[in-house]
C-alpha cells in the first residue's frame, strides 16, 4: 500500500468496467459468475478489468467480445454510473456504461448463464456488493432518459 500526501494508507485501485446491455423491451442483461471464480453464483453486469494501456471503453468492448461474443462500437457506450468498493486488499472502482446496440447474440462464453431482466427485478438478484448500488443509479438514468 502507498501513502497519500497526508500519510494515510491507500490501497491499490483496481479499475473495472461493466455494461448494462439494454434490449428493445428495456430489459438488462446480467450473467451468473461461474464456479471456481470469486463470488461464484452471483449475478453481475458483464465486463471486467481494464488492462494496462486500455481506455475504459476499449476494455469494455474487449470484455464484451470475450464474455458474450458480441461486437460493440465504442460510440455506442454511454457512461451511466460508478461504484466504489473494497475488494481483497485493493479498492475496486467499477464504471458502468449503458449500451443499447451491438452486433451478434449474447452467449455465456465465460459465465454460468445469462438472463434478461427488467431493471426493477435486479434488486431481487444476489449480486456482488459493488453491483448493488448501480441498480438504483441505473434505474434513475433509464427513467430520466425514457428507458
Identify the residue ranges that each predicted region occupies:
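A short coil-to-beta-strand element that immediately follows conserved catalytic motifs
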Residues: 71-81
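NUDIX/MutT-family hydrolases
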Residues: 96-98, 107-138
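Generic C-terminal helix-cap and adjacent flexible tail
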Residues: 139-147
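Conserved N-terminal beta-strand and adjoining loop/helix that marks the start
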Residues: 4-28, 49, 82
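Active-site-adjacent beta-strand/loop module that shapes the phosphate/pyrophosphate-binding cleft
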Residues: 23, 81-105, 115
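Conserved Nudix-box catalytic region and its N-terminal flanking loop in Nudix hydrolases
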Residues: 27-66
Amino acid at each position: 500500500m502507498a501513502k497519500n500526501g497526508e500519510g494515510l494508507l491507500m490501497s491499490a485501485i483496481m479499475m473495472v468496467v461493466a455494461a448494462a446491455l439494454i434490449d428493445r423491451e428495456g430489459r438488462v442483461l446480467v450473467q451468473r459468475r461461474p464456479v471456481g471464480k470469486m463470488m461464484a453464483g452471483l449475478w453481475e453486469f458483464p465486463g471486467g478489468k481494464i488492462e494496462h494501456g486500455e481506455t475504459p471503453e476499449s476494455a469494455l468492448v474487449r470484455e464484451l467480445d470475450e464474455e458474450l461474443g458480441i461486437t460493440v462500437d465504442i460510440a455506442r457506450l454511454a457512461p451511466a454510473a460508478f461504484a466504489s468498493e473494497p475488494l481483497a486488499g485493493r479498492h475496486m472502482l467499477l464504471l458502468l456504461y449503458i449500451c443499447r446496440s451491438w452486433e451478434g447474440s449474447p452467449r455465456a462464453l465465460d459465465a454460468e448463464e445469462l438472463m434478461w431482466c427488467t431493471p426493477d427485478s435486479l434488486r431481487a438478484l444476489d449480486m456482488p456488493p459493488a453491483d448493488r448500488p448501480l441498480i438504483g443509479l441505473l434505474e434513475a438514468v433509464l427513467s430520466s432518459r425514457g428507458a
